C-alpha cells in the first residue's frame, strides 16, 4: 500500500475506507485528512496498483480503518519507491514523446536534469512543501 500511495505510518493508522475514492479525472486517490504538520492532501495511487487498493476496501463501511494494525517494518524505502515511480509517471505525462527516466546520480544532483513540474507533483503527493527534500531524500537511487 505504501509503495502505491507514499503514505507515512501515522497517516496509515488514521486512514479510513472512505478516504480512498475515484478523483474527478478517474484516477484513484487517497485523501490524507491529517498529514505531516496537520495538513490535508491527496495522494494519487500509482497506475497498476488500483485493483489491489480497491479490493482492500471493497464492501467495507466508509468509516472503517483500512489498517487496524501495521507491521513494524520501516516504510521510508517504500515511500522512496513511490516518489520515484510517481516522478516517472508525471514526467512521462508532461512529455509523452520522450521516455522519462531518473537522471543518474553521479556527484551533485542538478535540478536542470529533472522535470520540475513532476518533482513538484511528487512533493505535494508526499506532503512536503520543499522540493529540495524530494531531491535529497527521494529521487536519489
Task: Describe each PLM feature range.
Residues 35-55, 63-82:
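C-terminal catalytic core of Y-nucleophile DNA break-rejoin enzymes
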Residues 12, 76-91, 105-106, 122-123:
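Short, basic/aromatic-rich helical patch in the C-terminal catalytic core of site-specific tyrosine
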Residues 11-14, 66-67, 134:
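A structural signal for short, well-ordered beta-strand segments and their strand-loop junctions
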Residues 27-33, 99-141:
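Short functional hotspots where side chains directly engage DNA or cofactors
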Residues 1, 71, 75-76, 111-115:
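Residue-level marker of regulatory loop/turn positions in helix-turn-helix DNA-binding domains and
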Residues 1-14, 85, 89-94, 116, ...:
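A short, glycine-centered helix-capping/turn motif at helix boundaries
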Residues 10, 14-51:
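Conserved tyrosine-mediated DNA breakage-rejoining catalytic core shared by Y-recombinases
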Amino acid at each position: 500500500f505504501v509503495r502505491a500511495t507514499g503514505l507515512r505510518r501515522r497517516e496509515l493508522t488514521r486512514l479510513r475506507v472512505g478516504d480512498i475514492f475515484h478523483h474527478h479525472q478517474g484516477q484513484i486517490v487517497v485523501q490524507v485528512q491529517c498529514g505531516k504538520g496537520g495538513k490535508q492532501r491527496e495522494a494519487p495511487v500509482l497506475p497498476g496498483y488500483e485493483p489491489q487498493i480497491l479490493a482492500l476496501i471493497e464492501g467495507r463501511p466508509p468509516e472503517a480503518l483500512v489498517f487496524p494494525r501495521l507491521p513494524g517494518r520501516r516504510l521510508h524505502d517504500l515511500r522512496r519507491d513511490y516518489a520515484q515511480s510517481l516522478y516517472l509517471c508525471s514526467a512521462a505525462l508532461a512529455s509523452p514523446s520522450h521516455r522519462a527516466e531518473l537522471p543518474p546520480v553521479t556527484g551533485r544532483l542538478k535540478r536542470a536534469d529533472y522535470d520540475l513540474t513532476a518533482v513538484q507533483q511528487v512533493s505535494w503527493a508526499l506532503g512536503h512543501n520543499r522540493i529540495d527534500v524530494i531531491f535529497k531524500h527521494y529521487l536519489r537511487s
